[in-house]
């Protein structure tokens, strides 16, 4: 079975991390920060510290993502994000969330994104791109650098076995995916996965599949898979039987 994960930001509120793990979650991807759409200033997500501490408290590997907008100088975005990466030391590859051009054309957006990826990438820090096909193929120009990045695809559907298993929404620049965000809006599942829901957080929560099992995930990141306690195994079995 594919490993299930969450992606989280301040909108989700503060979680009950024992419940998160008991719900069958194998990893989380946390919003590190991003760029404001007005002046282009960088910011840190206000619950990053809380979410990172929570993931560590139950031995869940986590990643960090950066909300990209095509502002320059790129060095400012790169340095800000890398400082957070160095502070929190995520086990999963770092992610650039690409879903808005903030009014810029494809040439400008592509140029700034390519420059950011170039500054972020290193053998020790591979970069993954989060995006949806309908945005990417329209607003980002093709370039060989994208092939060096893993894909975290977004397409919300409960009836698919992969982001494009129905033959639609295939990406121009990727033929495979590493993560797939398959659910988000209007699922009302935040409470089921250990988060407060309305009014203390978003009632919905973003759900993701890893393209492989939990054992595959740990092998990919080069970490030992933790041994679940009897209570954790029972809780996961109940979550699987009664469904999320």
Question: How would you name each of these model-derived features?
Answer:
Residues 1-125:
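Substrate-binding cleft of extracellular glycoside hydrolase catalytic domains
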Residues 1-10, 18-19, 144-229:
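Functionally critical loop-and-helix segments that line ligand-binding/catalytic clefts
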Residues 24, 32, 56-59, 85, ...:
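Sec/Tat-exported extracytoplasmic proteins
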Residues 36-37, 71, 136, 160, ...:
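Flexible, glycine-rich phosphate/dinucleotide-binding loops
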Residues 68-73, 104, 133-137, 224-229:
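Noncatalytic linker/hinge segments flanking ATPase motor cores
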Residues 77-81, 106-117, 137-144, 171-190:
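Short secondary-structure transition/capping segments
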Residues 92-168:
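Catalytic domains of cell-wall/extracellular-matrix polysaccharide-remodeling enzymes
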Residues 224-244:
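Amphipathic alpha-helical oligomerization/assembly segments
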């Amino acid at each position: 079975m594919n490993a299930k994960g969450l992606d989280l930001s301040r909108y989700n509120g503060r979680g009950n991390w024992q419940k998160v793990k008991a719900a069958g979650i194998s990893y989380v991807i946390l919003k590190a920060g991003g760029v404001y759409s007005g002046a282009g200033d960088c910011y840190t997500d206000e619950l990053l510290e809380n979410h990172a501490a929570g993931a560590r408290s139950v031995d869940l590997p986590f990643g960090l993502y950066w909300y990209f907008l095509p502002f320059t100088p790129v060095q400012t975005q790169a340095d800000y994000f890398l400082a957070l990466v160095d502070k929190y030391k995520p086990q999963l590859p770092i992610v650039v969330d690409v879903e808005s051009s903030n009014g810029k054309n494809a040439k400008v957006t592509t140029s700034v994104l390519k420059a950011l990826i170039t500054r972020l990438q290193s053998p020790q820090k591979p970069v993954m791109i989060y995006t949806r096909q309908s945005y990417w193929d329209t607003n980002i120009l093709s370039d060989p650098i994208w092939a060096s990045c893993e894909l975290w695809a977004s397409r919300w559907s409960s009836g698919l076995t992969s982001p494009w298993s129905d033959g639609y929404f295939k990406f121009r620049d990727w033929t495979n995916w590493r993560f797939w965000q398959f659910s988000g809006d209007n699922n009302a599942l935040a409470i089921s996965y250990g988060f407060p829901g309305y009014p203390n957080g978003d009632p919905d929560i973003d759900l993701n599949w890893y393209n492989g099992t939990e054992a595959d995930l740990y092998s990919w990141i080069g970490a030992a898979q933790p041994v679940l306690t009897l209570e954790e195994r029972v809780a996961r079995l109940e979550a699987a039987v009664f469904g999320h």
